[in-house]
């Protein structure tokens, strides 16, 4: 297989008509400023992403094809749009620094959608939807469609984890183009969303705050188990 891309958390290989997305046993924080080996993390995030992509396929089109145990997904190649789309249901993280009058975990009256330009050196700056259009990254109708798809997918995840009594705070998505259509790409895991279960983070926020790799792996195992158990009740 030909390596076509390597990022902080994944390697992507070309394999026939598909790409193989291999998840690393590494965890990073602060746009890669903090990095640690995390044995078993790749398999946990790959399996969880596979489950959640299957679940989300009922509400949005995705690049997911199949799970390749233990730590990879087969996906459809797509032209990735260099914008991260964050959907927030509760105030948290960088939003509190921008608007300190919000309380941590304050419920937002409706989902708040943010666009961030993907650039680690610039720390993925917040940008306006019009700037995405003016920069030629997406057409106006694509920006509208991306926002609608992101809210639909995020709401589906919130509803899924609500069944387990968990509090879905926010999620980061990426989108791409395939045959003139917009599709959800990248991954959906504890690396890309924040989830509180019984008041405890089962996501990468735990590592950001503690730098405890073993504790993160325990929480990712719990997250995968909760997700599987919740699926049996759908």
From Swiss-Prot:
It comes from Pyrobaculum aerophilum (strain ATCC 51768 / DSM 7523 / JCM 9630 / CIP 104966 / NBRC 100827 / IM2). SUPFAM superfamilies: SAICAR synthase-like. It catalyses: 5-amino-1-(5-phospho-D-ribosyl)imidazole-4-carboxylate + L-aspartate + ATP = (2S)-2-[5-amino-1-(5-phospho-beta-D-ribosyl)imidazole-4-carboxamido]succinate + ADP + phosphate + 2 H(+). PROSITE patterns: SAICAR_SYNTHETASE_1. Keywords: ATP-binding, Ligase, Nucleotide-binding, Purine biosynthesis. Belongs to the SAICAR synthetase family. Its EC number is 6.3.2.6. Pathway: Purine metabolism; IMP biosynthesis via de novo pathway; 5-amino-1-(5-phospho-D-ribosyl)imidazole-4-carboxamide from 5-amino-1-(5-phospho-D-ribosyl)imidazole-4-carboxylate: step 1/2. InterPro entries: SAICAR_synt/ADE2_N, SAICAR_synt_PurC, SAICAR_synthetase, SAICAR_synthetase_CS. GO terms for molecular function: ATP binding; phosphoribosylaminoimidazolesuccinocarboxamide synthase activity. This is Phosphoribosylaminoimidazole-succinocarboxamide synthase. GO terms for biological process: 'de novo' IMP biosynthetic process; cobalamin biosynthetic process.
């Amino acid at each position: 297989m030909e390596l076509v891309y390597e990022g902080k958390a994944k390697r992507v290989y070309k394999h026939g008509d598909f790409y193989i997305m291999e998840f690393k046993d590494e965890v990073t924080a602060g746009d890669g400023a903090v990095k640690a080996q995390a044995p078993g993390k790749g398999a946990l995030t790959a399996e969880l992403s596979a489950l959640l992509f299957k679940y989300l396929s009922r509400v949005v089109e995705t690049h997911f094809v199949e799970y390749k145990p233990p730590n990879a997904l087969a996906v459809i190649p797509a032209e990735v749009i260099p914008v991260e789309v964050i959907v927030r249901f509760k105030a948290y993280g960088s939003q509190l620094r921008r608007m300190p009058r919000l309380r941590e975990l304050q419920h937002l009256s409706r989902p708040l959608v943010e666009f961030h330009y993907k650039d680690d050196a610039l720390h993925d700056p917040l940008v306006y939807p019009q700037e995405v259009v003016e920069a030629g990254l997406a057409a106006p109708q694509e920006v509208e469609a991306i926002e609608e798809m992101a809210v639909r997918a995020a709401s589906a995840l919130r509803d899924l984890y609500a069944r387990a009594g968990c509090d879905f705070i926010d999620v980061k998505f990426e989108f791409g183009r395939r045959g003139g259509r917009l599709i959800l790409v990248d991954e959906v895991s504890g690396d890309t969303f924040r989830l509180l279960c019984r008041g405890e983070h089962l996501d990468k926020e735990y590592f950001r705050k503690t730098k405890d790799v073993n504790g993160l792996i325990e929480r990712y195992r719990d997250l995968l188990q909760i997700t599987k158990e919740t699926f049996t009740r759908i």
